[in-house]
Each structure stands twice: as C-alpha cells, then as structure tokens.
Amino acid sequence: VLSASDKANVKAVFGKIGGQAEEFGAETLERMFATYPQTKTYFPHFDLGKGSAQVKGHGKKVAAALVEAANHVDDIAGALSKLSDLHAQKLRVDPVNFKLLGQCFLVVVASHNPALLTPEVHASLDKFLCAVGTVLTAKYR
C-alpha cells in the first residue's frame, strides 16, 4: 500500500522526468533485453537492436502506462484495467517480467537523475512499480 508520502514521491519523480518518459521507456526496454535476454521471447517480430523504432514505439507505450498509473496513483487498477486484460488474456506475459521491467526502470531513472533518487524516493518508486506489476498480473488465472 502506497502511503501519502509514497504517492507524493512518485508524482515528483514523474513530474521531473515528464518530457523524457518516452526515452526512458525505450531505454528501460533496451536494458531489460540486454540484462534479461529471456524477455526477448515476447517480441520475436521486433528489431531489438539499440535505437530500434519498434523498441522506441513499445517504450512509448510502457512510458504512457507508467505515467497513466502515476497520474491515477489512487486507482492504479482502474487506470490500467484494459492493459491488465491484454497482458493476462491475450499476451500472457510471464508475471516475473513486470518485476524485471520495474528494476530496469529504476536503474534508468537513477542513471539520469541520481540526486532525485534518494533512499526514500527509491523505496516509494519501487513500491509503485510493484503495485503496477501486481495490477498487471491481477487478472491472470
């Protein structure tokens, strides 16, 4: 459960990275594919090379979902309901991959904004990303 302080920290992070969210989304995917190559199996039709238009396009979708969740931090489940349905019923992405993606996103945020990611903010952002992952896997059976 995100506290009021966690919610404020999450909103502050997304306020700070706002204009870079799409780039962060693509960089997060690139990092995930390089660090956890097994995640590539969900994208057999993608050019997964660095700077790929397809990775950038999907990174934009990832970023949009995270921004949407941050903008609706009091109702992440409602904000991501359709995306949860898609991942559970059609794409059937292994739930562990959401955790891996979240870890990579934390690294990207930290690498670009080291002063922003204090221990408290890091903990809040990690809790938020775990909440997003929980929502995205809630409809799995």
From Swiss-Prot:
It comes from the Eukaryota. One of its GO terms (cellular component) is haptoglobin-hemoglobin complex. One of its GO terms (biological process) is hydrogen peroxide catabolic process. GO terms for molecular function: haptoglobin binding; heme binding; iron ion binding; organic acid binding; oxygen binding; oxygen carrier activity; peroxidase activity. Keywords: Heme, Iron, Metal-binding, Oxygen transport, Transport. Red blood cells. SUPFAM superfamilies: Globin-like. Involved in oxygen transport from the lung to the various peripheral tissues. Heterotetramer of two alpha chains and two beta chains. Belongs to the globin family. This is Hemoglobin subunit alpha-A.
